[in-house]
């Protein structure tokens, strides 16, 4: 709800332009992107509990400022503060689960977190529209205050203070060194990079043509700044907000591609489908929310179900692939909706699409937990969430362009006596008052065609997400149990790298038992990150972390020696 763009501090109903600008370029989005990556570092440098509570406090303060804003300037400033705070909330929740639950159980809990996130993404704007139409837009922000207080109390009372004190050796650094770890150079360059890209995608094809000098200049400057950002990240090394060693890992970049595309598809459907109900079926904001329940329920149920299935099967890559396929098919079916489509169609299509998003959206965060050592998990989580959020922003901007251009061309082609600019400036429920009754049928057809065209964007992005899903390595969230006899010691399990877990784990086990005196004498490609009686080892050839239980690996070592 707090993401809904409010151009004026008044009590007018949300217009189509307001809804289409739900996630465009603005200061909150820019600072949100910055904050997401920054929190990846901050969670390594400071205790997760207190960073999460501070982020929540900033979000609450920003919401309070927005709700009480006497002018648009106050609203903008409040959204900046809220954006800085909200950037650390979802990543913090994921990391808190990672601290208290073993890897094989995190899929289920992350599934529930993802289900709630999906519900909020769809229901939030609809509730915001209802508040704006029936009460006041300020309630969109004030409602966050009691919810945030309850969350803060729960985290404060139930999460121990020093549970992760040994998580990262950098936590003992002085403040000056910690500031150097934050990669301020990269952050400074990233701000104008994001602004240029978002402005170009938002203005191109609407305010200016794609060939306009302003749009070309924005893309060129954005590209140059992006190159500069990459150079800075390489120069900064492990201090970078996006460390090159992290980007090289197949799991990270494959999950980033997948999340960028699938979440972009999800947001396009989430924000244009309610418009279809309001414009074509004559729903109010509240009614469109009710008719959108099949999508919400589909995403929620299958998100939890996927988490349980990953917990049982051990693998998550299959869920990403299945999610891409179902989402692409579901979005394609939604693009066939007509003015006279019956309930069976729009309910069934929503359930299918929701199932795809439910299966796929949360798995990249599980993949990060399975593939990365502890000291990189917060940064890896932040990168994936950043790409997810950025992908949604770009997809919405592209879909907005498609809708605006198609609607204008349809209105002109149908000869409907209405100003397209005036049509875009009113709410979707106010269409009948714009034209004479004999033209309303043609207006509905023009609107239907324009909205369903945006679902092609959802089809394309869901289809592209498959490129990322099939590249995500098949790693298991279950602990590897070593065979008891030497004959089967080298047996390769399905989807397992041919290198045995003994080969990978032995240096770490020997170091732990004192048989190797110095860690420096071993290859730097092997990292020891103990947790929950596990030893995590990293093989540079596979670029993944493989885990084995200390006890079972000792048995395998003994078996080989014999």
Swiss-Prot record:
One of its GO terms (cellular component) is plasma membrane. It is a multi-pass membrane protein. It comes from the Eukaryota. PROSITE patterns: MFS, SUGAR_TRANSPORT_2. GO terms for molecular function: transmembrane transporter activity. It is found in: Cell membrane. The chain crosses the membrane at residues 50-70, 80-100, 111-131, 139-159, 184-204, 215-235, 257-277, 288-308, 309-329, 351-371, 383-403, 455-475. Residues 515-562 are annotated as: Disordered. Glycans are attached at residue 448. The keyword Signal does not apply. It holds the Pfam family MFS_1. Induction: Expression is up-regulated during the late stage of P.nodorum wheat leaf infection and is controlled by the cluster specific transporter elcR. Residues 533-554 have a biased composition (Polar residues). Its main location: membrane. Keywords: Cell membrane, Glycoprotein, Membrane, Transmembrane, Transmembrane helix, Transport. GO terms for biological process: transmembrane transport. Belongs to the major facilitator superfamily. TCR/Tet family. MFS-type efflux pump; part of the gene cluster that mediates the biosynthesis of elsinochrome C, a perelyenequinone phytotoxin structurally similar to cercosporin. This is MFS-type efflux pump elcC. It comes from Phaeosphaeria nodorum (strain SN15 / ATCC MYA-4574 / FGSC 10173).
């Amino acid at each position: 709800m707090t993401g809904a763009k409010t151009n004026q501090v008044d009590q007018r109903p949300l217009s189509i332009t307001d809804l289409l600008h739900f996630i465009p370029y603005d200061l909150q989005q820019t600072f949100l992107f910055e904050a997401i990556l920054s929190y990846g570092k901050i969670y390594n440098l400071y205790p997760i509990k207190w960073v999460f509570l501070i982020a929540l406090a900033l979000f609450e303060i920003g919401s309070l400022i927005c709700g009480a804003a006497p002018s648009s300037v106050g609203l903008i400033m409040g959204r900046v503060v809220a954006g800085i705070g909200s950037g650390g909330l979802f990543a913090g929740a994921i990391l808190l689960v990672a601290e208290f639950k073993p890897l094989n159980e995190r899929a289920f809990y992350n599934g529930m977190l993802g289900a709630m996130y999906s519900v909020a993404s769809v229901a939030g704007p609809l509730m915001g529209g209802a508040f704006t139409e029936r009460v006041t837009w300020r309630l969109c922000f004030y409602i966050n205050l009691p919810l945030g207080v309850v969350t803060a109390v729960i985290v404060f009372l139930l999460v121990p203070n020093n549970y992760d004190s040994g998580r990262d050796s950098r936590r003992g650094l002085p403040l000056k060194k910690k500031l150097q770890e934050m990669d301020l150079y990269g952050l400074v360059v990233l701000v104008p990079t994001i602004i240029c890209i978002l402005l170009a995608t938002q203005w191109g094809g609407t305010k200016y043509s794609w060939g306009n000098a302003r749009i070309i200049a924005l893309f060129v400057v954005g590209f140059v700044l992006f190159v500069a950002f990459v150079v800075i990240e390489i120069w900064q090394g492990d201090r970078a907000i996006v460390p090159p060693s992290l980007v090289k890992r197949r799991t990270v970049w494959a999950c980033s591609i997948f999340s960028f595309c699938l979440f972009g598809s999800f947001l396009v459907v989430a924000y244009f489908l309610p418009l279809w109900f309001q414009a074509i079926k004559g729903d109010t904001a509240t009614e469109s929310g009710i008719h959108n329940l099949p999508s919400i329920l589909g995403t929620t149920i299958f998100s939890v179900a996927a988490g349980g299935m990953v917990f049982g099967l051990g693998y998550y890559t299959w869920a990403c692939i299945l999610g891409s396929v179902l989402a692409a098919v579901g979005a394609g079916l939604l693009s066939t909706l007509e003015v006279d489509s019956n309930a069976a169609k729009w309910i069934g299509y929503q359930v299918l699409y929701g199932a795809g998003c439910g299966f796929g959206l949360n798995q990249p965060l599980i993949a990060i937990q399975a593939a990365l050592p502890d000291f990189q998990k917060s940064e890896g989580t932040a990168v994936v969430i950043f790409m997810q959020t950025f992908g949604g922003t770009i997809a919405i901007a592209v879909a907005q362009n498609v809708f605006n251009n198609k609607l204008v061309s349809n209105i002109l082609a149908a000869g409907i006596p209405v100003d397209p600019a005036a049509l875009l400036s009113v709410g979707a429920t106010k269409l009948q008052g714009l034209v004479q009754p004999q033209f309303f049928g043609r207006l509905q057809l023009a609107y239907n065609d324009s909205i369903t065209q945006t679902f092609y964007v959802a089809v394309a992005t869901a289809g592209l997400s498959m490129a990322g899903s099939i590249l995500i390595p098949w790693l298991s969230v279950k602990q590897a149990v070593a065979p008891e006899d030497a004959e089967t010691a080298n047996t390769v399990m399905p989807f397992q790298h041919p290198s045995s877990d003994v080969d990978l784990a032995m240096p770490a086990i020997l170091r732990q038992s004192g048989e190797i005196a110095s860690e420096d004498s071993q290859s730097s490609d092997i990292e020891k990150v103990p947790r929950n009686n596990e030893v995590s080892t990293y093989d540079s050839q596979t670029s993944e972390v493989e885990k084995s239980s200390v006890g079972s690996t000792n048995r395998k070592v003994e078996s080989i020696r014999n």
